[in-house]
Amino acid sequence: MKRTSKRILLLAILAIIGHITVTAGAYKSFKVSIYVRAYEVNKMKDIQWLDSTWNIISKQLDVDKIYLETHRDLLIVDDATLNQAKEYFHKKGIETAGGITYTIDESNSFETFCYSNPEHRKTVQEIAEHTAKHFDEFILDDFFFTSCKSDIEIKAKGDMSWTEYRLKVMTEAGRN
């Protein structure tokens, strides 16, 4: 009897999933947006890869908007790839916007930029300008923070706590 109950439960779950899949695209109360990391956006230079990957996604989900990340871990997606990806999605009636993840190396304890370092600030600005060149709208991934404790940071921190110092630095970085 337990086995029959499990089968009935499994069939009920599959029926619900099937119903959700069939009715996908009939969204009335919300829009669906997805975020694509720079690693995958960079692969979009291969139109066959893009098309086959998008076919898998679009069979499962009716997407209204896609955020194409332009930078992550010092990988900057080139202009030609971004233009090709934007054109591909626009032809399908999908809005595009940009995204940025300000990391240097995620695998190294989420190494981020040091916002008191003028060279890092210059790179961050170049990434933002590169993204703004392609998109009227972009978002920052949740890596807009710093955990840097370089000599520059230690000197700039002075007598402030790390929390006070980082709040000050990131507020200023966000504004400028």
Where are these regions (language model features)?
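Bacterial N-terminal signal peptides that target proteins for export
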Residues: M1-L9
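Glycan-processing catalytic domains of CAZymes
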Residues: A24-N176
